[in-house]
């Protein structure tokens, strides 16, 4: 990872806290997805917003008044997810009796485990591929120096707000498409995706303007002490990444829609393209353009993934529509024959 020796211990402290708190992340995702599976997509979104705002508040609290440094940032992440996990669990148990487990529910079922693993392994591998790309970027940033690392980290914290918003769009359209795909309502899928894209564009435009307008005030919040070089590194990252937020919205919505129509291969291939795009930019663009070349690796990765996701989405919609039309024509023909 090319981590500078002077910040190795800080990195170790952050990683130790985050890995120790993996259970909080697991249970938060578990209960929020249980609620979505039971048809309640609004409540997990509310808890996601609460978790994000709480994370930002705790970041400021632990870093500024308490002087806990990077370990404080890690604790802020873990505690915000833990609190949200508890809220999700309490809400689920209170409002959905099916989540109140009995003794017999704890019996092991090999068939159920196999079904879960069949879905979990591809998704887990997909997320791992995305993380490898981010590690390549971080490794390239680490070569530049500690100020670049601090600036990149501060900007990433701010950028995370937009990522969470777009993930929410992806989760929303995923549930919507899955329900309508199961019911064979292709027209509703097209309308829903179109509406989500429009809302996503508006949301990303607003988020982008807000971030760029307030960056001079927000960036210092995530800095331990005033430093002009760190500030400029963070600012450069935001000016590169923010104008491409519209692509992030497209990526989240199209990928989730395709997955919800039963295609797990295409999103996986899109992740592979993202991975190689990030690695290529991190290794080669950084040689010619330095830090800004690394920053551009994320937008290039989004563009690469969209090159496969967008055509596949519209081809899938067209294919399903034609199949439905053929079945409808066949049914009409059978009715006419019966009448004769």
What is each model feature region?
Residues 6-10, 70-71, 112-119, 141-160, ...:
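Interfacial/gating helices of multi-pass transporter permease domains
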Residues 77, 86-130, 319-340:
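Interhelical loop/hinge segments that connect adjacent transmembrane helices in multipass membrane
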Residues 37-38, 65-67, 71, 143-146, ...:
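Helix-loop interface residues and adjacent transmembrane-helix termini in multi-pass membrane transporters
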Residues 5-28, 228-251:
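Alpha-helical transmembrane segments of multi-pass membrane proteins
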Residues 52-86, 217, 275-307, 311:
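Membrane-interface helix-loop junctions in multi-pass transport and translocation proteins
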Residues 25-44, 151-215, 248-262, 266-270:
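Small-residue-rich hydrophobic transmembrane alpha-helices
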Residues 17, 28, 51, 80-84, ...:
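Transmembrane helical elements of multi-pass membrane transporters/channels
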Residues 1-16, 208-228:
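Short membrane-interface helical motifs at transmembrane helix boundaries
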